[in-house]
Structures are given as C-alpha cells and as structure tokens.
Swiss-Prot record:
UniProt family annotation: Belongs to the urocanase family.
EC number in record: 4.2.1.49
Protein task: Catalyzes the conversion of urocanate to 4-imidazolone-5-propionate.
Cofactor: NAD(+)
GO CC annotations on file: cytoplasm
Alphabetical list of PANTHER family matching this protein: UROCANATE HYDRATASE
Compartment annotation: Cytoplasm
Chief localization: cytoplasm
Catalysed reactions listed for this entry: 4-imidazolone-5-propanoate = trans-urocanate + H2O
Organism: Enterobacter sp. (strain 638)
GO biological process, one term: L-histidine catabolic process to glutamate and formate
Enzyme class of the recorded protein, top EC level: lyase
Keywords linked to the UniProt accession: Cytoplasm, Histidine metabolism, Lyase, NAD
Protein name (database record): Urocanate hydratase
Length: 561
C-alpha cells in the first residue's frame, strides 16, 4: 500500500447527544465517516477500506485526520469540499447549503481506466470511493440485504410460481456487499451455497449471522444443500474456495441449482478476484510486483467462472449478473457471449425504479437500537397497507444484527420518502427518539446512477450510457439542501463503467430541517421517475402523472400545474 494508508487504530462513532462538532449538521457527517471505519462495519479499517475491493472512506490517514478536524470546526454557513477522499477547501455558503460536497474517483472519460486510476492512486492523487464508502453512508451488509431479497423474491415469482421453498441459490463472494446474499436468500425462503476465498470473510458473516453454517468441502456442502432443501428448510452454507474452480466443477458434476448469480469483487481484477491456483497472500504480493500479469490471471479465472454460469443458463437455470461487471471482464478476455444472461436490474428490479422505489436507509446517531425500533413502527404506521414492507421490517428486526450505529434499510419510493423523513424529524423534535437521525441511500437508486452493465442496462430507449442523469441528481440535491452530496465514478462495476451520486439529509427536529427534508426527499426519488419516464417507461409516466411531476416533454404530466 502507499504510505499513509495503514494505521492500526480502532475508530467508533460517538454515541449519545454530546456534540463533538458545532452542530448536528456537522456532527452527522463526522459520526458517519467514523462509522464507516468501525471494525464492526468496515472490511479492512486499518487501511481505510470500507467495502468493495479498495472502496475507502478517506484517501489516507492524514486526510482522515484533516477531515475530522475540518468537520469539528465547520461553521453553520460553511461547506467542506472533499476531492477523492482529501479535504481541499472550506468555503462560506449559507445555512441551507450542504455542509459537505464530495467528488470521488472522477476521471475524464478517455482516461477512466483502472490502469490510469491505479497510477494516480499509487501517487496519492486519487481514491476509489465505491458508492457509500467514500460518501460516508455505508451501514454494513444490511445496506444491500433488502435489494438482494427483493431480487430473489421476484426471481421466485417469475420462475417458481412465487415460492423458493425447497430451492437453492448458488453464488460467490461474502464481502461487504456479497455478504448480504446468504441472509437475503434465507429471508426469501431459499437455501444458498455461498463460495468465498477468504476464511476471514466467512468468519465475519458467521459472527454477524449473515450466514448459518460452513461446509468442510464441496461434497459436504452439497450433502447439506440436499438435506435442507428436501426438508423444506432455509439454511445458508458457506464454502471456502475459489468460485472459478468450484462453479465449473458443479457444472461438470451435473449439479443443478435453482438460481445462479455472483457477487465477488470482479469489478476490480487487481484487488478483488483471486486467480485460480493462487493464495490470497500471493495475489496481494503479485498485485504490487506484476499488476498486468495479475489482472490477466484474474480475468482468465473470471472467464472460466462466466463460462460455467453460461452453462447453467443453457441448462435453463435462471442465471443473472448481480452488478459486479464479471460479464464485461470475461468478454474482454474472449468470452464473446458473456452477456447472454442478464443483469439483475433489467431482469427483476426496473419496475421498482420506474416508481422511484429504491434503498432508502436511515441511521440513529444516538447509537440506541430503540430509536430504530421506534422508526420501524412509524414506517408501519405511515405505510399502513403494504404487507410486504411490514414483513420485511419484521424479518429485519429478527434476523439482522446492527453493525456500528443502528440503522435500517427499507425500499420505498417517491410516494413515501418525504412523508417518512418528515415523520422522523417530528420524532426528533418531540423527543420520541433520543437524538437526530440521518437519512441516505445507496447510489444504486432509480435516478442517481448511469451504469450500462448494471442499473441502466438495456434501457428501452438505448440511453444506457447517458450520465447526465446522476449529475442532475447531485445538482438538484445540492440545490434542495441535502446535508452532504457526493458524485462518484466507477462504483460497483469499476473504472469507466459508471457514474453515480449520493445524498444524506439530517433530521434534527428543527423547522429548517423539515423544509430541507421536504425538498430533498421529494426531489431525489422524483429524478428517478423523471429519468425512466424520459426513457419511455409507462410505469414511470403513470407515476409522474399521479405524483404531479412537471416534466415538460412528457405530455401526460402537463395541465396540472
């Protein structure tokens, strides 16, 4: 690693109501930055890595210290600018402006490659922010559990008459994102076999109850799968090994899963996908001494993995890419038909995006789990007639361990986000919860990302690669008064393949917060409805009309203003 990226230090966000910074609007980003590096949350906190290969919260430890110092002293009418994990300026703005504006990993398109980025990273000039690592709103694996759950449920509806009972999912990767898969499969009613090449990550998921058991070897894993599926039980099984070896072996044995996907860190071949025959230590060493050879070896292994996934697809097994760009990596190494199986968004999620539905999340800055349980109840009260959502909240409370500050993920859309945010703000005002709440989301949302191999794959108008939309989303959230706004490149699928934006808003119980919340939590999901309506999706056009959006080029929305 470059100098300054390693420091052995245990970081945990402050709890309670005593401020370190000058107001809750600066205390909130300070606590969430620290929470991203909590050892219960981050994958490799000593190197500032939160999740997703090398997704960091700050460029180096010197930058981290400077961010903390800046946030601690930031005034209520100042804005901190963060450039690829480095605090570069504090400017006078106004009290309703964002307190922090973040730009991470952005490169001019011609130079937007891993090779160029890695050169800059080695010089200390850049940082990979993933999506929520560098934007300080990562909440551990819970952040993707419901999205994965919704995907598996929809796959069961489409392929298995609405039930995954007695069926099993084959997948790989138990990192910060992939670690959600076993629990999501369990909650969706399926067993799962989860391949992971690092024992430490399996241990982490066992400890946090995201995975139930570990098998000793492939034969043992298959025996357990056969036993549990025949009994109609839902048990998740981890297997330590290399997916590029094990998935082809399953094809060779004629084993037939019921769903096949993958969430290894294939988006980053230099840091995130172990070549076959290599130990993890060897991989890390060769990444430094022979990066080109390492990338080639990783991509060759990905090619074998994808060929096996294609074989399952050819058998008629529902097979889909879960957004890690493994198909692209395989295609670059010669697997011309790598895109013969779809990504999860066009296959299962896009109708939700058309209504602005996506990963709404909130965090109790108090550190008190009771604050989250009270907000769970408030969501049920407000969204009273959504049995599916209520079921999710019940399962989340029962099965999901909080990592770091207590948090909740809950997929809701344009119709509800503003109402929920205002209700949470009122709970802070009345003292029903003990401290302010922050509301954010993944950058994987309906209007905040352009990613042709993931969120915007196979758009019906062909606009997959148009990245004006996340830029407009970030600009509108800034104008609307979000507490911090981020604009990133390369999250999820790697350099050159995505641009995306994030926002976080603080509910501190004030009238001023209520006004900001009303703007931000309407406008943010509305950009998703707008983006899909512009692409011609009837569901989005109908939603825009129902919600009174003013979209000048969409005739159905005119005449109501």
């Amino acid at each position: 690693m470059s100098s300054g990226k390693y420091r052995q230090q245990e970081i945990r966000a402050p709890r309670g109501t005593t401020l370190t910074a000058k107001s809750w609007l600066t205390e909130a980003p300070l606590r969430m930055l620290m929470n991203n590096l909590d050892p219960e949350v981050a994958e490799n906190p000593n190197e500032l890595v939160v999740y997703g290969g090398i997704g960091r919260a700050a460029r180096n430890w010197e930058c981290y210290d400077a961010i903390v110092d800046s946030l601690t002293h930031l005034e209520s009418d100042e804005t901190l600018l963060v450039q690829s994990g480095k605090p570069v300026g504090v400017f006078k703005t106004h009290e309703n402006a964002p307190r922090v504006l973040i730009a991470n990993s952005n490169l001019v398109p011609h130079w937007a490659t891993w090779e160029h980025f890695n050169e800059l990273d080695a010089k200390g000039l850049a940082m990979y922010g993933q999506m929520t690592a560098g934007s300080w709103i990562y909440i551990g694996s819970q952040g993707i559990v419901q999205g994965t759950y919704e995907t598996f449920v929809e796959a069961g509806r489409q392929h298995y008459n609405g039930s995954l009972k007695g069926r099993w999912v084959l997948t790989a990767g138990l990192g910060g994102m992939g670690g959600a898969q076993p629990l999501a499969a369990t909650l969706a009613g399926a067993c799962s076999l989860n391949i992971e090449c690092q024992q430490s990550r399996i241990d982490f998921r066992l400890r946090t109850r995201y995975v139930d058991e570990q098998a000793d070897n492939l034969d043992d894993a298959l025996a357990r799968i056969n036993k549990y599926t025949s009994q109609g039980k839902t048990v998740s099984i981890a297997l330590c090994g290399n997916a590029a070896d094990i998935v082809p072996e399953l094809v060779a044995r004629g084993v037939r899963p019921d769903l096949v996907t993958d969430q290894t860190s294939a988006h980053d071949p230099l840091h995130g996908y172990l070549p076959t025959g290599w130990s993890w230590e060897e991989y890390q060493q060769k990444a430094k001494t022979d990066p080109e050879g390492t990338v080639l070896a990783a991509k060759k292994s990905m090619a074998e993995h994808v060929r096996a996934m294609l074989a399952f697809s050819d058998m008629g097994v529902p097979t889909f890419d879960y957004g890690n760009n493994i198909r692209q990596m395989a295609k670059e190494i010669g697997v011309e038909n790598a895109f013969d199986f779809p990504g999860f968004v066009p296959a299962y999620i896009r109708p939700l995006f058309c209504r602005g539905i996506g990963p709404f999340r909130w965090v109790a800055l108090s550190g008190d789990p009771q604050d989250i349980y009270k907000t769970d109840a408030k969501v049920k009260e407000i969204v009273a007639d959504d049995a599916h959502l209520h079921h999710w909240l019940d399962m989340a409370r029962e099965r999901i361990n909080f990592q770091g500050l207590p948090a909740r993920i809950c997929w809701v859309g344009l119709e509800w986000r503003q109402k929920l945010g205002l209700a949470f703000n009122e709970m802070v005002r009345s003292g029903e919860v003990s401290a302010p709440i922050v509301i954010g989301r993944d950058h994987l949302d309906s209007g905040s990302v352009a990613s042709p191999n993931r969120e915007t794959e196979a758009m019906q108008d062909g606009s997959d690669a148009v990245s004006d939309w996340p830029l407009l989303n970030a600009l509108l959230n800034t104008a609307s008064g979000a507490t911090w706004v981020s604009l990133h490149h390369g999250g999820g699928v790697g350099m050159g393949f995505s641009q995306h934006a994030g926002m976080v808003i603080v509910c501190d119980g004030t009238d001023e917060a209520a006004a900001r919340i009303a703007r931000v939590l309407h406008n943010d999901p509305a950009t998703g409805v707008m983006r899909h309506a512009d692409a011609g999706y009837d569901i989005a056009i109908d939603c825009a009309k129902e919600q009174g959006l003013n979209l000048p080029m969409i005739a159905a929305t005119q005449g109501k203003h």
